[in-house]
Amino acid sequence: MAKEKFERNKPHVNVGTIGHVDHGKTTLTAAISSVLTKTYGGEVKDFAQIDNAPEERERGITINTSHIEYDTPSRHYAHVDCPGHADYVKNMITGAAQMDGAILVVASTDGPMPQTREHILLSRQVGVPFIIVFMNKCDMVDDEELLELVEMEVRELLSEYDFPGDDLPVIQGSALKALEGEPEWEAKILELAEALDTYIPEPERAIDGAFILPIEDVFSISGRGTVVTGRVERGIIKVGEEVEIVGIKDTTKTTCTGVEMFRKLLDEGRAGENCGVLLRGTKREDVERGQVLAAPGSITPHTTFKSEIYVLSKEEGGRHTPFFKGYRPQFYFRTTDVTGTIELPEGVEMVMPGDNVAMTVTLICPIAMDEGLRFAIREGGRTVGAGVVAEIVA
């Protein structure tokens, strides 16, 4: 069977379901797939297919995730759903599935539960920009006031973590009843789809962002100067443009005098492309792997930041023992390792393999970073954890 061509005529948006265990995330995922396919066409995935989440590896970490796709008239959505709480933690911290917005599922029979709070906190830490609430199992609650109470509670909880709790959409529905084809509950799924379309803005494409290229290699070409190579992470670099070399040492400015790809000279290098950039007047020894080439003023170097970390379990090939304050591993950013020290939150004495924890990291030399940057934690080249920059301190 021939592969379907990927249609690029609609904006592509990444979403996912989050929330407490057994509140109905996977059932909702199946219901969205079922109702939208029935309404707008496409291929339906049932509960069993979604629940049987395949294993993926991201930065050496095993994560179970289900990916489904669905369409509304105006957009194409890629949706992730994870079977277990640990999978969510890993998924969100590694950025294995970056979300432009999340659907928080709360069972109206229970109200917010511990993992509801934890997923909201994680969303805040890893930079999920928008949350829409789906109150599930509303068919099992007869008391209108109880539903109002749960909605208030969820809104307050979201506000506590700096999400606009008073303004974000809350849809009251029943994923199971919608899946069983009951029209009044199917309508709620369409209402949720409408909220996705209107509340989550169209994400900026990588190519529209400010130019940045993590440097992987540096060469000297006699008579022409210094060439740095790497994959353009976002934006476009054009010949003749000024760029900054950021990280590890003091920031310097230079000009791009050439772009080449597969030994051909080009006018520009774009997001996603591997290319070599020729730099005017830059010496071979002034540039090194681990620095980035960036649009002037678009990114700055920092040494201290707050982060959210997931520590690999022994089974995942991580540490066999906990670590304590004063732990000094390497932090792998983009293309290089930098040693750093950690500061644990008050009251946390040690961190066990398999835990996730918020910690402050101080690196021995600055790295170009902004909030949301992912990194790995390594000991002698072996990955022992994954993290994300939650807030820059210095």
Swiss-Prot record:
Region (G3) location: 81-84
Domain tr-type G residue range list: 10-204
Listed GO CC annotations: cytosol
Main localisation: cytoplasm
Keywords: Cytoplasm, Elongation factor, GTP-binding, Hydrolase, Magnesium, Metal-binding, Nucleotide-binding, Protein biosynthesis
Region named G2: 60-64
Pfam family membership, one: GTP_EFTU_D3
Keyword DNA-binding: no
InterPro entries: EF-Tu_GTP-bd, EF-Tu_GTPase, EFTu-like_2, EFTU_2, G_TR_CS, P-loop_NTPase, Small_GTP-bd, T_Tr_GTP-bd_dom
Residues at which Mg(2+) binds: T26
Reaction catalysis annotation: GTP + H2O = GDP + phosphate + H(+)
Amino-acid positions noted as binding GTP in the UniProt annotation, renumbered to this chain: 19-26, 81-85, 136-139
EC code(s) of this entry: 3.6.5.3
Annotated stretches, region: G5: 174-176
Location(s), subcellular: Cytoplasm
Stretches the record annotates as G4: 136-139
Top-level taxon: Bacteria
Gene Ontology molecular-function annotations: GTP binding; GTPase activity; guanosine tetraphosphate binding; translation elongation factor activity
Location of region: G1: 19-26
Family per similarity comment: Belongs to the TRAFAC class translation factor GTPase superfamily. Classic translation factor GTPase family. EF-Tu/EF-1A subfamily.
Annotated PANTHER family: ELONGATION FACTOR TU, MITOCHONDRIAL, ELONGATION FACTOR TU-RELATED
Quaternary organization: Monomer.
Function: GTP hydrolase that promotes the GTP-dependent binding of aminoacyl-tRNA to the A-site of ribosomes during protein biosynthesis.
Protein name as catalogued: Elongation factor Tu
The organism of origin for this protein: Shewanella sediminis (strain HAW-EB3)
